[in-house]
Amino acid sequence: YRYQSPSFSFESNVYYMKYKDQLILTGKISEIGEMLTKNIPDSYRMGLELASAIRFNPLLRWDGNLTLSRNKIKNFTEEDIDVYDTNDKWLESRSTYLGTTDIAYSPNIVANSLLTFTYNRFEAVLHGHYVSRQYIDNTSCNDRSIDPYFVNNLRLAYTFALPHTKSVTAGLDINNLFNVEYETNGYNSHTYYVGDKRVNEKRYFPQAGTNILANLTVNF
C-alpha cells in the first residue's frame, strides 16, 4: 500500500517467506573466524514493513521506518554439544529438541527515525536507530543474546561556495550522541556441559561510545 501527498507519505508491505533447507548462521565461528552456517529443514520469515514521512513546514521534516517480524525455525534440535565430567573427561555428545525457536541474528523489531532541520545552507539531522533483542544462536535463550539497543546520531552540515568550486560542504557527525553502551554482534566461541551445567563461552563486539567525525566535501 502507498499513499503520498505534498506533506505526507506512507508505505506498507507484508511479506511471508517459507523455506526448505534455509542456510542460517549457527552462532559459532571457524578456526579462522568465519561465521558457520547450516541448513535448517523447515523455517519461515514473516513481517510488516512500514515507512512514513511528514513535512511539518519548509524547515522541518520527519522520516521513519519500522519492521515487525517473526523469524522462526520449526522442530529445531540443538545437536552435538559435548558433555564432560568434573575432571574434564569427555562423556558424550548431547542433542536437545527445542521445538519452535527464533532464527539467530534476526531481531523482531527494527526502527529508524530521522528528524531533519534545514535552514538556508544549514542542515541538521537527528537519526535514532532501535534494534530489539536478537539471539546469537538458534536456541532462543536470553543468556545467549544481544540486548536491545537504541542509539542516536547527529549530523550537522553547512554548504557554501568558494572560488573555482560548485559547492563546499563542511560536516560534523556526532555518533552515539548519548554515549550508550551496546553491542551489535556476538558469537559462541565454545558451548559444552560439565555434568548438567551448561557453559557458554560468549564473545561480543562492543561499539564505540560518543565519537565525533569532521568532514569536508568539495564539488568542482
Language-model segments: which ranges?
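Repeated loop/turn-to-beta-strand initiation elements of outer-membrane beta-barrel proteins
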Residues: 7-10, 58-62, 121-125, 162-168
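Residues that define the transmembrane beta-barrel architecture of outer-membrane proteins
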Residues: 4-6, 42-46, 107-111, 148-152, ...
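Flexible, surface-exposed loop regions and adjacent strand-edge segments
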Residues: 26-36, 69, 75-90, 131-132, ...
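Gram-negative outer-membrane beta-barrel transporters
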Residues: 15-19, 38-138
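C-terminal beta-signal and adjacent terminal beta-strands/loops
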Residues: 130-136, 158-220
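Membrane-embedded beta-barrel scaffold of Gram-negative outer-membrane proteins
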Residues: 1-39, 44-46
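Residues on the lipid-exposed face of transmembrane beta-strands in outer-membrane beta-barrel proteins
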Residues: 1-3, 48-54, 64, 113-117, ...
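Extracellular/periplasmic, surface-exposed regions of secreted and cell-surface proteins
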Residues: 23-25, 37, 50, 79, ...
